[in-house]
């Protein structure tokens, strides 16, 4: 696994062995970032269930301003991969329960332009992640949440204020793009 393009292009990323981490494949990441296009540039990124950090580090390599990477078990791997890519200055690693970190980020008043969420497949956390991010108001008004799930899992078309706007399947993975809709009623 490697960074595909940008300032850290070609940098190999370390991956944990036997911890149940399922890194997003290079091909899937390449397609994802092609769809995101210029949205990545200067973005504030949050990577939930970060694992190896490949998604956030790819975004930073492509010009994102800052990224927060959250994972319960792979903190040392995240730090090593940020060091390898020379992106430590703009990568903030947080170790702990994803939902606890979502609450902490909300308490700090943080918002993000781009949120990646890649919970373990078939764990049933997809709706919970959307609900937690929505309740914490972490997504900026014009932001995008990208949810990776198993291809066989049910697609969540609406959850709270989130609506699915696009989905693509890549092998065993399905990438769902969700926007946050707010009511402008006076």
Question: Model-predicted segments: where are they?
Answer:
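Class I S-adenosyl-L-methionine-dependent methyltransferase catalytic core
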Residues: 1-183
């Amino acid at each position: 696994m490697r960074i595909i393009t940008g300032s850290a292009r070609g940098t190999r990323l370390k991956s944990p062995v036997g911890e149940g981490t399922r890194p997003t494949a290079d091909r899937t990441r390449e397609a994802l970032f092609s769809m995101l296009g210029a949205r990545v540039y200067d973005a504030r990124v949050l990577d939930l269930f970060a694992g190896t950090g490949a998604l956030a580090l790819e975004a930073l390599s492509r010009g994102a301003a800052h990224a927060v990477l959250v994972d319960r078990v792979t903190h040392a791997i995240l730090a090593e991969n940020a060091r390898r890519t020379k992106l430590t200055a703009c990568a903030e690693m947080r170790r702990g329960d994803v939902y606890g970190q979502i609450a902490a980020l909300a308490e700090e008043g943080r918002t993000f332009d781009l949120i990646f969420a890649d919970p373990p497949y078939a764990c049933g956390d997809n709706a919970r992640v959307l609900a937690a991010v929505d309740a914490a108001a972490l997504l900026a008004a014009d932001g995008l949440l990208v949810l990776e799930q198993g291809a066989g899992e049910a697609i969540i078309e609406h959850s709270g204020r989130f609506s699915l706007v696009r989905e693509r399947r890549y092998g065993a993975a399905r990438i769902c793009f969700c926007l946050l809709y707010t009511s402008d009623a006076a």
